[in-house]
Amino acid sequence: MVSLKPSKQRKLLYTLPLHQRKKLLVAKVSDDIASQYGIKRIRVRKGDTVRVMRGGNSGKEGKVVEVNTKTGRLAIEGITRKKVDGTPVYVWIHASKVMITKLDLSDPRRREKLEKSKK
């Protein structure tokens, strides 16, 4: 039985093993990718091009530079802020708040999986 208590739900998210936490790094794909491959969402990877859909950076687009599996957030090229000393740092954005506009198909396994799901 799964608990309905919010505190236990949060604890479950915080204590998930990394191999299960990667399932939380899923984002919606654009309409042209969805029609091409017959998928609605896919796990975000380094190299994918994404568009931010929510928040102060909404509408901005860039390539994923880094994916943090522990926090479920992405660093996107071109979306930075300045520290007090002037050095730029990435703004980490949650994977659920972006939409994938271009897939990185350099990995043969990923390409094969997408071709298999094609309708």
Curated annotation (Swiss-Prot):
Pfam families: KOW (PF00467), Ribosomal_L26 (PF16906). GO terms for molecular function: RNA binding; rRNA binding; structural constituent of ribosome. InterPro entries: KOW, Rib_uL2_dom2, Ribosomal_uL24_euk/arc, Ribosomal_uL24_KOW, Translation_prot_SH3-like_sf. The keyword Ribosomal protein applies. GO terms for cellular component: cytosolic large ribosomal subunit. GO terms for biological process: cytoplasmic translation; ribosomal large subunit biogenesis. Keywords: Ribonucleoprotein, Ribosomal protein, RNA-binding, rRNA-binding. SUPFAM superfamilies: Translation proteins SH3-like domain. The keyword rRNA-binding applies. Part of the 50S ribosomal subunit. One of two assembly initiator proteins, it binds directly to the 5'-end of the 23S rRNA, where it nucleates assembly of the 50S subunit. Located at the polypeptide exit tunnel on the outside of the subunit. Belongs to the universal ribosomal protein uL24 family. HAMAP family: Ribosomal_uL24_A. This is Large ribosomal subunit protein uL24. The gene is rpl24.
